[in-house]
């Protein structure tokens, strides 16, 4: 089987975009092969469909939603167009909304891409047992994924495995398509993201996370009841977040940042 693909790097969250037509039922198994370091290697796989006069379609490997892949899809559409700037509509698995994105070429194979994200279905403060101690988390339910955001003072001092075990134990009681842990330091403006996708049974401590950045923006905006605008430093790069609050309600969230592309290639799989 010959697979055409291109590798995107949105702020370090390496993503394989499969450009060939594939059978949906085989996508999880195909993604598992492509993700192996001895094959292509990346943090995630998305299946890209582009048709004239229709939104760009991104189907993630486990049917989850991904903000970084969605904005990268807009950047790829701009790359294909040969233009230097453009607005695009993007549809992604795990999300019922068509998302509006804007992409700008900075240099060859390097773009900035921003996308208006779906608003959380719910944001609530919860207590979770972490190593025998109660800790406050913000549970941010987004289309296709639930993030558990915990504020810390210093990301370098956090025992991420202990926090992940707490989230995993908590989430085991629910049938979630995908869920994540976001350790965020408001002082440092740094975050450590982890995402688990149930369909593919994959856990990644990601280099950056778009939906996790949305979760941080939502938690900050709902906690402070005011607009949020900052750049979050992630293990593999930076993501800009902007949240607008009106009459005490969260009305809009936008994320963005750099996207790099490799060359379009083809691989033959047995």
Describe each region flagged by the PLM.
Residues 119-138, 158-167:
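Active-site glycine-rich loop that binds ribose-phosphate moieties when present
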Residues 112-120:
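Membrane helix-loop-helix hairpins that form the core translocation module of multi-pass transporters
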Residues 1-111, 141, 146-270:
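A glycine-rich beta-to-alpha transition motif near the start of alpha/beta enzyme domains, typified by
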């Amino acid at each position: 089987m010959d697979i055409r693909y291109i590798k995107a790097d949105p702020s370090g969250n390496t993503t394989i975009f499969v450009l060939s037509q594939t059978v949906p039922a085989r996508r999880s198994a195909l993604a598992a092969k492509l993700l192996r370091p001895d094959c292509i290697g990346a943090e995630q796989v998305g299946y890209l469909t582009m048709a004239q006069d229709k939104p760009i379609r991104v189907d993630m490997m486990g049917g989850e939603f991904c903000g970084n892949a969605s904005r990268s899809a807009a950047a790829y559409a701009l790359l294909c167009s040969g233009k230097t700037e453009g607005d695009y509509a993007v549809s992604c698995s795990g999300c019922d909304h068509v998302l509006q994105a804007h992409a700008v070429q900075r240099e060859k194979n390097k773009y900035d891409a921003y996308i208006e994200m779906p608003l959380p279905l719910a944001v609530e403060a919860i207590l979770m047992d972490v190593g025998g101690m109660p800790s406050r988390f913000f549970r941010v339910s987004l289309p296709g994924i639930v993030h558990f955001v915990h504020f810390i003072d210093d990301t370098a001092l956090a025992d991420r495995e202990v926090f992940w075990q707490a989230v995993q134990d908590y989430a085991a009681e629910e049938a979630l398509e995908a869920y994540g842990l976001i350790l965020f330091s408001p002082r440092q403006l740094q975050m450590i993201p982890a995402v688990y996708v149930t369909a593919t049974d994959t856990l990644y401590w990601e280099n950056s996370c778009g939906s996790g950045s949305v979760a941080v923006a939502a938690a900050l905006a709902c906690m402070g009841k005011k607009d949020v605008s900052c750049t979050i430093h992630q293990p593999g790069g930076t993501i800009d977040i902007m949240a607008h609050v009106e009459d005490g309600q969260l009305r809009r969230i936008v994320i963005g940042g750099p996207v790099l592309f490799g060359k379009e290639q083809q691989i033959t799989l047995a």
